[in-house]
Amino acid sequence: MNQAVGTQILTLTGLRFDANLGILDHEKAAPQPIQVDAELRLGVQPLAPRDDDIGHVLDYRRVRQIIIDECKAEHVNLLESLIGKLAHRLMQLPGVLGVRVKIAKLEIFDDCEVAIRIETGQW
């Protein structure tokens, strides 16, 4: 009997924390709040895992921690630099075929947020 399959995408939405990011004096002086959204395309997977064991799937706790660690590792001047570094790191996870990431500076301006989005790999 054939097992049913579907395309699986792991999504983390609205992950908020402070990071050292930016070129403005106040950005260099203190961390600022950012928000990260990430989608990881895992490709065709069984509709249900072969068993109920976390060791046989991509653990979203690990993905969350990688995002936080990469974004907090060091001061980065540009959103473009940070998102490229993060997307590259997420693409290295086992089974990941494609990555979509968005990083937003939440308080850079009084009247809006500023964000950048990148997509890499297979979609």
Predicted regions and their residues:
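N-terminal, polar/charged subdomain of small-to-medium soluble alpha/beta proteins
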Residues: 1-123
